[in-house]
Amino acid sequence: MSDTNKVYLSWADVDQLVSKMMPQIQSYDYELVIAITRGGIIPGAIIAERLAIQQVLIASVDFYEDEEHDLDWPVFMQFPADSFLRGKQALIVDDIWDRGKQVVSVAERIRYAGGRSLSAVLHYKPHRSQFSDKSPDFYGAITKDWIIYPWEVERGVLGI
């Protein structure tokens, strides 16, 4: 991992990042929040609370490499039913846009189901993104650091 500078965030830091995004996020209407596991669950709940959105859904996506084509293909372990997304505006929330694969895959799956989406992440790493033509719609900060969020402190302490 090239991001060697570990930065440990406090809950107050997370609150500041969410607060920074809220004016832009609030300028759109959403019917639901889709939090990407695991990192997006807590910021997704915080944002949903601030927007007074009752529908908070989970998207769990993993990637497996196709050895023949050397491509990563998303495997959705958990995802809302297409019929629930059709015609709806969703806000996708994750903690960080590193390579961008998770957010982009979730957005494409929502679009395929007939829904619309915007995305919000606490941190954006444009230098690591695999997508030159895509980025999060909203982000709290741009970083090159390895971010350790308050809900994953043990992970940072153990060096995982």
Question: Which residues does each predicted region cover?
Answer:
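PRPP-associated nucleotide enzymes
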Residues: 1-160
